[in-house]
Design a protein with these regions (language model features):
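Active-site mouth loops of central-metabolism enzymes
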Residues: 56-67, 116-122, 248
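Structured C-terminal cap/extension of enzyme domains
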Residues: 21, 40, 192-195, 210-308
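C-terminal segment of N-terminal export signals and the immediately downstream linker at the start
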Residues: 25-53, 63-64
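Conserved, mostly hydrophobic/aromatic
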Residues: 40, 52, 85, 98, ...
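N-terminal secretory signal peptides and thylakoid transit peptides that target proteins
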Residues: 1-19
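Glycine/proline-rich, positively charged
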Residues: 61, 119-206, 210, 217-223, ...
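Glycine-rich, proline-tolerant flexible connector loops at the mouths of alpha/beta enzymes
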Residues: 86-101
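Acidic (Asp/Glu)-rich catalytic clusters
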Residues: 41-44, 99-108, 132-137, 163, ...
Length: 308
């Protein structure tokens, strides 16, 4: 947390209050409304409800052309108020590419950096953290997570030490694809986690039964991965018409329909869709603005897609 992040938050607060002042020659009132924010339960710090994942999309190797295209994607993310970027040593060159992009974006929002430890080796966790710091160009990660519970007992104990010493600000665990939910719930119950990351979307709703209520009870922030089912939702439903009533909660395309379903769950703190396209990033970020579907509308959304 630095002076820049505080000033940014102050600007967003003033904007939300309807106060306008010059910014780049334009009144602030002319800019898009700030995206929705949610508090991290363990501290109350507010973060945007929409972050960015990097799995596959930022694993582009050393290609200058592809890296520069990702700079444009990250620039749009920051221009729209995005903050949380999530990656992992598991994601090939994604962390290296992220470091490349962070050095080249202009006037970014305050980054909320999130990465993971993914190794069965005890000593390997330290090696991965140091490598992530070097690749990103970050001296302190906001969030460090144990990826897919791999060697979680050892790594989580180390993360607790790192948090106390100030090497990281928050700690958490992750799962995806619906794996190991029983084990995941046990760790949630037993450990003082700031964040949990899991898969949730309009078709994959198993976490509604246990993990999301448990996170709410335990005061753990929830990051949602695979909100588009890795593109599967578009393949299944993208050729069907969007219902007219989706405009009532501001969804003008399927991406916003799917994201607003995820973001409207009261236990969800942030979703991290991944994209390599500037236009898709624009659509995604718009989903974090405006009204969200209520409980009745959420049921209507589920019923609609299940009938297609």
């Amino acid at each position: 947390m630095n002076a820049h992040s505080l000033s940014r938050r102050r600007i967003l607060t003033l904007a939300a209050a309807g106060l306008a002042f010059p910014l780049g020659g334009l009144p602030l009132a002319a800019a898009p409304r700030p995206i929705a924010m949610r508090p991290i339960p363990s501290t109350g710090e507010a973060i945007p409800v929409l972050g960015m994942g990097t799995w596959i999309t930022f694993n582009v190797g050393s290609s200058s052309r592809l890296r520069d295209e990702r700079v444009k994607v990250l620039q749009v993310f920051f221009d729209h108020g995005g903050r949380m970027v999530d990656s992992s040593p598991m994601y090939g060159s994604a962390e290296d590419v992220m470091g490349y992009c962070l050095k080249r974006v202009r006037d970014p929002s305050p980054l909320f950096s999130a990465t993971k430890i993914w190794t069965s080796s005890d000593a390997g966790g330290v090696v991965q953290m140091q490598a992530s710091e070097r690749l990103w160009g970050e001296s302190q990660f906001d969030l460090q997570q144990v990826h897919n519970l791999l060697n979680w007992e050892f790594h989580l104990a180390r993360l607790k030490e790192w948090k106390v010493s100030g090497l990281i600000r928050y700690l958490g665990i992750t799962t995806s694809h619906g794996r190991r939910h029983s084990d995941f719930a046990e760790v949630m119950q037993a450990e003082p986690l700031d964040f949990v990351q899991l898969t949730y979307n309009i078709l994959d709703r198993e976490v509604e039964d246990r993990l999301l209520p448990l996170a709410a009870d335990r005061g753990q922030a929830v990051i949602v991965n695979r909100p588009f089912q890795r593109g599967g939702l578009f393949q299944s439903f993208g050729h069907h018409p969007l219902p007219e009533w989706a405009r009532e909660f501001g969804a003008r395309n399927w991406a916003q329909f799917f994201l607003k379903f995820v973001l409207s769950h009261p236990a969800v703190t942030c979703a991290i869709p991944a994209t390599s396209q500037v236009g898709h990033m624009e659509e995604n970020m718009a989903a974090a603005r405006g009204p969200m579907p209520d409980a009745d509308t959420r049921r209507r959304m589920i019923d609609y897609v299940e009938r297609l």
